[in-house]
Amino acid sequence: MSEQKRVIYTKEELAAKVKVPAIVEQDLKRIISDRLEQCGLYYRCFSRIKTASSMAHKFALKDYGAENKKLQDLVGVRINLYFDDDVEICQNIVENTFDVIGWSTSERSEEEFKPTKLNGVCRLPEYLRSEISTETWDMYIDDTFEIQIKTMFFEGWHEIEHDMRYKGEELWKNYKGFSRYFNSILATLELCDKSMVTLFEDLGHSLYKSGRWSDMIKSHFRLKLGEGQLYPEVAKLLDEDCDQQVENLAKRIYKTSKQTLVDQLLHRSRKVPINVNTIIALLNDSQFHDSRLTAIFKERDVYNDGREESLGESWHYEMKPLIRHNVFQMCTQVDGSRLKEEKTASAAEIFQQAADAIYGWIVGKYGGLFKEMPQKTSTYHADICLLYTS
C-alpha cells in the first residue's frame, strides 16, 4: 500500500470542518439504553464523540484513503454487560435496531490472553447524520458509528491494557515474565466471567429441585425484576403440575433460554413490567399455551398489573406507519384576472403565484422559529415522505 495514497489531516483542519452536535451521541446512547432497559439486561452504557486530536492521531497511524478506507468511529458507544452470555443477546439487539455493516472481535490465541470485546460498525440513522456538518463527509470519514460490547470484568482492565500494552509495547520488551503475569490476570478475569454464569445456572437448577419457582426464575434468567410476587394461584398450579407430569411447566420455564424471553420482551408493542408473573405469562403466550395459565393471567390483567406510566415510555418503540385518510378537503377558486401580466396567465401560473404569496406569508410569520424552511415552494410528489427513526 503506497505512502502516496495515505490521507492525513491536521488537528486544526479536523476541528474546523468536523462538527458533531451532542444530540448525535446522546440519541444513539438513548436508543440503545431504551432497548436494553426494555428487556431488563444488567448493563452500563457510555458514549463519546472523537476529538479532533484523536482523529488526527488515528489518521497519522492508519492508511485512510487507500482503497477508499475511511475512519468509522467518529461516534462511539460502549456497552458493558454483567453476564458473559448477554454479549450475544446484546449483539442481536443491536442488529435488530441499527443497520450493522460488520462485526469484529479480539484475536485470541492459546499463548496470549487479551480483553475480549466485540466491535460493531453501524450506519448512522439518517436524521442523526444530517445533524453533522456536511464538510465531514468530504473527508475520509464514514457516516458510521462504532459499538463496543464487553463484560464488566474486562472493562475494569481494558483501558489499562489498551494504554499500557496495546499502545505501550515498549514497556514489555525483554520482560516476558511480567507479560505472562499480566496474561494470567486476564485469564482469571475470563474464568470469572464464565464462572459467574455457571454459578447462577447451577443455583437455578437447585432452586428448581427445591420448588422455589420465583427464585428459580430470578437466578436462571438474570434480569432486572420488579417487586411483584408470584400469584398464589400460579404457584399452586406449578406445584400441582410438578407432581403429575415429567415435562411439567416449571421444568419448561427452566429449560427456556434467556434469548427466547428477551425476544418476547422486545416484541411487545408496549413495555411491560418485568417480574416473575409477566415472565411466565410471556412464555406461556409464546411457548407453552397452557389454558390454565392463560385464564389466570387474563383475570389478573398481568401485563398492566404494577405498570408505572412514564412520559418517556414511548421512546422504547418504533413508530407505526401512518395510514392516510382524508379528514378535510376544500375547493378554492383563485381569481387571476387581477394579475398584471402582458399575456393572460395560465391556470398553472396563477396557482404558482398564489402558492408563492401564501408561502411568503408563512415564512415571514414562522421563519424565525424554523430555520431550515425551504426558500421557495416546489411540486408535491406522493412518494415523498418523512421517516422518523425511534
Model segments located where?
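Short Gly/Thr-rich strand-loop-strand
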Residues: 103-124, 128, 132-137
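Flexible glycine-/small-residue-rich
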Residues: 81, 122-124, 149-151
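A common structural junction motif
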Residues: 95-102, 168
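Short helix/loop capping segments that flank catalytic or ligand/cofactor-binding pockets
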Residues: 89-90, 129-131, 155-158
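Charge-rich, low-complexity segments
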Residues: 1-74, 81, 85, 269-354, ...
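Conserved small/polar residues in nucleotide/adenosyl-binding loops
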Residues: 388-389
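An acidic, glycine-/histidine-flanked metal-binding catalytic module
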Residues: 4-10, 14, 20, 141-286, ...
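Active-site metal-binding core of divalent-cation-utilizing nuclease and nuclease-like domains
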Residues: 368-383
